[in-house]
Design a protein with these regions (language model features):
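Expand to "…catalyze enediolate/carbanion chemistry for C-C bond making/breaking, isomerization
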Residues: 1-411
Length: 411
């Protein structure tokens, strides 16, 4: 079941250089991801061993992963004009801005088009401001219509004035192109210390969000620029570094209650074999070890992000798509039955504090269980029918409110 994008937060954002973007790019990524599964974890036993899952859970997860990669391999794609693109001649970037927009228009007509999409421009700093603005203007000039859930990602933000500048620019571009005001959303990349703590010692993120004047859809964490800015040695710059945990915690607190989506960063350990075909048996075995190690590493990082309340992250390589979906589905499936039982018990007792086995439930826990089941349905880990074992219909889950659910049942 594919839910409407209004019900969803994408589980990932896939980044790809603008110079490489073609109408068929999402489908090609899915095909490459399926090839990796077939080569390195094609059956339930090898899949379970690779990711450290028990066989029953692995069987359910693998089936869902394959179906996902065949039908909708990419949930969110970002056409990248920053790190994944680099600095090129003015004429070359002009050409890629136009060609990427035309390719996007064609891609919308193809099956499996991502329900979320957008572009990442260069930073609005003194060095790259003119280039960033020109790329965005040229891109929009080619677009007669925007796909749903289109966003512009602003990297390396250090000052609310940069968010305000992008907002002003989008106001003008929407008016020029005849788009509904406010259609284009902004994602702010939190990858500098200045985006965490302002020069006056206060939290910076609320000011950044405010400067976007209602356009800010999400905050995306950039772990490698952030750790480098914190003077952490290159060998220690990683997604699960304690410095990154602090930044993510600040992001969560700053965005709480604002309806803003949070995204974690990427793993740079890619599932790429060392030896190309034709390879000897020994080389194939070495490839298998290398790829499966990277798969497990990515899987574990995604699970860690999920456990810490980051339900979206970056993927940089098609080989990361299988483990992204596997981690998400496993995270929700393994807790479906306990969560559903606890929620059913909670609702049956009319929101009074109860005991379900040895686990104590109060109202806050019940709200968390409700949110868990809704996210599980929205990401495709399980169906509304499976979530109904909680005793709630999908409409009740979507209400997100125990008061509404209980009042409707008392009526």
């Amino acid at each position: 079941m594919v839910l409407s994008s209004a019900d969803r937060q994408p589980v990932h954002t896939v980044y790809g250089g603008a110079q490489l973007f073609k109408p068929e790019t999402p489908a090609r990524l899915g095909a490459h991801a399926l090839d990796l599964i077939r080569t390195y974890a094609s059956d339930v036993d090898s899949f379970a061993q690779c990711l450290g899952l028990d066989r029953e859970l692995a069987e359910a997860v693998l089936a869902r992963v394959v179906t996902k990669l065949e039908c909708e391999p990419v949930e969110d794609f970002r056409i990248d004009f920053e790190d994944g693109y680099g600095y090129r001649s003015e004429a070359e970037e002009d050409g890629h801005a136009r060609s990427a927009a035309r390719a996007l228009a064609q891609a919308q007509k193809l099956p499996g088009f991502p329900p979320f999409i957008g572009i990442r421009i260069k930073p609005l700093t003194e060095i790259s401001r003119v280039r960033a603005r020109r790329t965005l203007e040229l891109f929009f000039a080619e677009m007669s219509d925007l796909p749903p859930n289109f966003a512009v990602t602003l990297p390396k933000i250090t000052d609310p004035a940069q968010a305000a500048e992008l907002t002003d620019l989008l106001d003008g571009l929407e008016a020029r192109q005849g788009f509904k005001p406010g259609t284009v959303k902004i994602e702010l990349m939190i990858e500098t210390p200045q985006a965490i703590i302002d020069t006056d010692g206060s939290f910076a993120i609320p000011k950044l969000i405010g400067a976007a004047r209602g356009r800010c859809r999400g905050l995306h964490f950039g772990p490698y620029d952030y750790t480098a800015s914190c003077d952490i040695a290159a060998a220690e710059q990683r997604l699960d570094h304690p410095a990154c945990d602090f930044a993510r915690n600040v992001m969560q607190v700053s965005a709480a209650g604002r309806g803003i989506l949070l995204s974690d960063g990427p793993s740079t350990m890619l599932p790429v074999p060392r030896h190309r075909a034709p390879a000897t048996d020994e080389q194939q075995a070495e490839n298998r070890v290398i790829v499966q190690r990277a798969m497990r590493h990515h899987f574990d990082l995604v699970q860690r992000s999920l456990a810490n309340g980051f339900y979206q992250g970056w993927d940089l390589h098609p080989g990361q798509l299988p483990t992204r979906y596997a981690a998400v589905y496993a995270f929700f499936l393994k807790s479906l039955q306990p969560a559903a039982a606890r929620l059913r018990n909670f609702v049956d007792q009319a929101a009074r504090a109860t005991r379900a086995g040895e686990v104590f439930d109060d109202a806050a826990t019940g709200q968390g269980l409700l949110n868990f089941l809704l996210r599980g349905v929205n990401c495709g880990a399980f169906t509304p029918e499976e979530a109904a074992s909680s005793g709630l219909a999908l409409e009740e889950l979507r209400s997100r409110s125990f008061v509404t659910i209980l009042d409707s049942r008392k009526a």
